[in-house]
């Protein structure tokens, strides 16, 4: 059994790893900063690691893991092995954006409000120097489409202020008011009719004022006359009161006459 195992492993002993990269790796990536070692450098010449099967090729992902840990933005390597996974989604998004740019159907108003939100930054899946990689062009087209849709979704300011939908327009209410005011409005100030009206109004105002003044003066005059008459009456009352008092005093001082019969006797 050991001899059989030794016979199986003996052709691979001392044989280095294959130096040619597999079809999954892109050529021309050697020597770029920030990249891990290329698949051709995975195996050192002269290593004694045995190969399990000669007809199968192994893929070492340690280079991708090291490169992702070294880059702070955690961007994936620009390899075709990952590009195949994302080409379908990006091609579908790019086709939709190109249809909108080439005069396709307009988006509903709800989509414009979503496009105005913060845009999520997609990772850079490819470089310009990589042949056959359309991801940078698709990302640029998508960005331009989003910007154009956001600008088109913003409402343009109206040329004139529009009235609210719940209330009637302001131009309808002042119409009857203006008509009423126009019906009540008199003649022009320069017309003779206007002057005659003004003169008649002035005369009426003057008459009313003069009448009020005359009434006031008459009332004041009557007040003065009544006050003087009242004073005279008070004086007359006082005079009569004094006369009455003097007469009473005079009659009290008079003696009773003897020739007068006593009261209660008959003189006949």
UniProtKB/Swiss-Prot annotation:
Skewed-composition ranges (Pro residues): 155-173
GO biological process: DNA-templated transcription; fat cell differentiation; hematopoietic progenitor cell differentiation; inner ear development; negative regulation of DNA-templated transcription; positive regulation of osteoblast differentiation; positive regulation of transcription by RNA polymerase II; regulation of cell differentiation
Basic and acidic residues bias locations: 177-201
Name of the protein described by the UniProt record: CCAAT/enhancer-binding protein delta
Covalent cross-link site, Glycyl lysine isopeptide (Lys-Gly) (interchain with G-Cter in SUMO): 120
InterPro entries in the cross-refs: bZIP (IPR004827), bZIP_sf (IPR046347), C/EBP (IPR031106), C/EBP_chordates (IPR016468)
GO annotation, cellular component aspect: nucleus; RNA polymerase II transcription regulator complex
Family per similarity comment: Belongs to the bZIP family. C/EBP subfamily.
Domain bZIP residue range list: 191-254
Gene it is expressed from: Cebpd
Key words, A-Z: Acetylation, Activator, DNA-binding, Isopeptide bond, Nucleus, Transcription, Transcription regulation, Ubl conjugation
Residue numbers of N-acetylserine PTMs: 2
A Pfam family recorded for this sequence: bZIP_2
Chain positions covered by the region annotation Basic motif: 195-222
Subunit structure: Binds DNA as a homodimer and as a heterodimer. Can form stable heterodimers with CEBPA, CEBPB and CEBPE. Directly interacts with SPI1/PU.1; this interaction does not affect DNA-binding properties of each partner. Interacts with PRDM16.
A Gene Ontology molecular function term of the record: DNA-binding transcription activator activity, RNA polymerase II-specific
Gene3D superfamilies: 1.20.5.170
Tissue: Ubiquitously expressed.
Region annotation (Leucine-zipper) ranges: 226-254
Positions of region (Disordered): 1-50, 98-132, 152-223
Annotated PROSITE patterns: BZIP
Main localization, broad class: nucleus
Entry's localization field: Nucleus
Protein's UniProt keywords contain Transmembrane helix: no
Function: Transcription activator that recognizes two different DNA motifs: the CCAAT homology common to many promoters and the enhanced core homology common to many enhancers. Important transcription factor regulating the expression of genes involved in immune and inflammatory responses. Transcriptional activator that enhances IL6 transcription alone and as heterodimer with CEBPB.
């Amino acid at each position: 059994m050991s001899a059989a195992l030794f016979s199986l492993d003996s052709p691979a002993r001392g044989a280095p790893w294959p130096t040619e990269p597999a079809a999954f790796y892109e050529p021309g990536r050697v020597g770029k900063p920030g990249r891990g070692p290329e698949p051709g450098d995975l195996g050192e010449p002269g290593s004694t690691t045995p190969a399990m099967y000669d007809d199968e090729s192994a893929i070492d992902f340690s280079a991708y893991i090291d490169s992702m840990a070294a880059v702070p933005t955690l961007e994936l390597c620009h390899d075709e092995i990952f590009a195949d996974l994302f080409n379908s989604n990006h091609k579908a998004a790019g086709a939709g954006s190109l249809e909108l740019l080439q005069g396709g159907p307009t988006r509903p108003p709800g989509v414009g409000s979503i496009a105005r939100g913060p845009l999520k930054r997609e990772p850079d899946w490819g470089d310009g120097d990589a042949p056959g990689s359309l991801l940078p062009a698709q990302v640029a087209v998508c960005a331009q489409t989003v910007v154009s849709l956001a600008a088109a979704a913003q409402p343009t300011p109206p040329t004139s202020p529009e009235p609210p939908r719940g209330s009637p327009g302001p131009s309808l209410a002042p119409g009857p008011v203006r008509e009423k005011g126009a019906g009540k409005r008199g003649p022009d100030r320069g017309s003779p009719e206007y002057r005659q009206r003004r003169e008649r109004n002035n005369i009426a105002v003057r008459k009313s004022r003069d009448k009020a003044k005359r009434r006031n003066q008459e009332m004041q005059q009557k007040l003065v006359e009544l006050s003087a008459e009242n004073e005279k009456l008070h004086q007359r009352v006082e005079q009569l009161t004094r006369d009455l008092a003097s007469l009473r005093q005079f009659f009290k001082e008079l003696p009773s006459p003897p020739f007068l019969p006593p009261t209660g006797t008959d003189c006949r």
